[in-house]
């Protein structure tokens, strides 16, 4: 299904409509340039749609130095937007993988988190997307991903719970098959 992308001017008019919907005057001094600022910020906030995960992970190193344990990158900070309410959720991602024939520069793991976070998301889907993209592109023995996040849709509206942390995990390969690897990963990340 192809979606016709509106022009910037149509998007700005949509922001003006929302401002009128909440009872504001989009032409008053403080709001006059708000549509421009919102569209510019949305281009950055949602820039993940333009990112190619395969390109991010294409530079691999085959010399693993006979490393046979797991590699982890913990505490990758992110902010994304919930696709249900278009409100932000923020937290940390922990990624581990057990290399088979190659490794990747650790900054690449942070880049794929950013690529998926800078889209409308749900945390569950983002957890799977990160794990599966590492699995598909690096072909490791297994991948583990844990995301812990605070959701504005819980703190700013509805149940008004501002300290509730949602945790999601996804495992592939040896992490999915062998509890000892999951246990080690969870012990490592539970202190973070």
Swiss-Prot record:
EC number: 3.5.4.16
Keywords: GTP-binding, Hydrolase, Metal-binding, Nucleotide-binding, One-carbon metabolism, Zinc
Positions annotated to bind Zn(2+): 82, 85, 153
Tagged with keyword Mitochondrion: no
InterPro entries, alphabetized: GTP-CH-I_C/QueF, GTP-CH-I_N, GTP_CycHdrlase_I, GTP_CycHdrlase_I_CS, GTP_CycHdrlase_I_dom
Catalysis performed (reactions): GTP + H2O = 7,8-dihydroneopterin 3'-triphosphate + formate + H(+)
Molecular-function GO term, any one: zinc ion binding
Pathway annotation from the record: Cofactor biosynthesis; 7,8-dihydroneopterin triphosphate biosynthesis; 7,8-dihydroneopterin triphosphate from GTP: step 1/1
Highest taxon above the source species: Bacteria
GO cellular component labels: cytoplasm
Enzyme class name: hydrolase
GO biological process, alphabetically ordered: one-carbon metabolic process; tetrahydrobiopterin biosynthetic process; tetrahydrofolate biosynthetic process
NCBIfam families for this protein: folE, PRK09347.1-2, PRK09347.1-3
PANTHER family: GTP CYCLOHYDROLASE 1, GTP CYCLOHYDROLASE I
Quaternary structure, from the entry: Toroid-shaped homodecamer, composed of two pentamers of five dimers.
Family note: Belongs to the GTP cyclohydrolase I family.
Name of this protein: GTP cyclohydrolase 1
Organism: Rickettsia bellii (strain OSU 85-389)
């Amino acid at each position: 299904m192809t979606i016709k992308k509106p022009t910037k001017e149509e998007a700005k008019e949509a922001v003006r409509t929302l401002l009128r919907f909440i009872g504001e005057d989009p032409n008053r001094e403080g709001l006059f340039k708000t549509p421009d600022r919102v569209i510019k910020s949305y281009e950055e906030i949602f820039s993940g749609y333009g990112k190619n995960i395969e390109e991010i992970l294409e530079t691999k190193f085959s010399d693993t130095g006979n490393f046979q344990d797991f590699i982890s990158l913990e505490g990758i900070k992110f902010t994304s937007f919930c696709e249900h309410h278009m409100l932000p959720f923020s937290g940390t991602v922990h990624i581990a993988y057990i290399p088979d024939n190659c490794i990747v520069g650790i900054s690449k793991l942070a880049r794929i988190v950013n690529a998926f976070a800078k889209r409308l998301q749900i945390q569950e889907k983002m957890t799977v997307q990160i794990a599966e993209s590492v699995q598909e592109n690096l072909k490791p023995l297994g991948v583990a991903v844990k995301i812990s996040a605070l959701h504005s849709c819980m703190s700013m509206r509805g149940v008004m719970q501002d300290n509730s942390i949602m945790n999601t995990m996804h495992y592939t390969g040896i992490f999915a098959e062998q509890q000892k690897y999951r246990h080690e990963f969870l012990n490592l990340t539970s202190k973070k």
